[in-house]
Amino acid sequence: EPLCRRQFQQHQHLRACQRYLRRRAQRGEQRGPALRLCCNQLRQVNKPCVCPVLRQAAHQQLYQGQIEGPRQVRRLFRAARNLPNICKIPAVGRCQFTRW
């Protein structure tokens, strides 16, 4: 886990993924440049760390207070869990983490 935290920091806290997740949670937007950049960032992360860093990215959005209400929180975490599939990252598939 400390290794994954370090990866999270090395890859600019997956900023593009955070941007994508925020838009997805707030407006349900699925496309756009943030997604492409996010997938590029995710592909550079060690496979075992993909889900942990996505969980961190989702939490970062929560802490920044950008996500409002249970519906947006649900959408945020659902989107984060699905990103490895959307980005077609081999051998990761859907992340299993829950909100905490």
From Swiss-Prot:
SMART domains cross-referenced by the UniProt entry: AAI (SM00499)
GO MF entries: nutrient reservoir activity
Function field: Heat stable 2S seed storage protein having sweetness-inducing activity.
Name of this chain's protein: Sweet protein mabinlin-4
Bilayer-spanning residue ranges: none
Alphabetical keyword list: Disulfide bond, Seed storage protein, Storage protein, Taste-modifying protein
Protein family: Belongs to the 2S seed storage albumins family.
Alphabetical list of InterPro entries matching this protein: Bifun_inhib/LTP/seed_sf (IPR036312), Bifunc_inhib/LTP/seed_store (IPR016140), Napin/2SS/CON (IPR000617)
Organism: Capparis masaikai
Gene3D superfamilies in the record: Plant lipid-transfer and hydrophobic proteins
Assembly behavior: Heterodimer of a small A and a large B chain linked by disulfide bonds.
Disulfide bonds: 4-49, 17-38, 39-87, 51-95
Keyword Disulfide bond attributed: yes
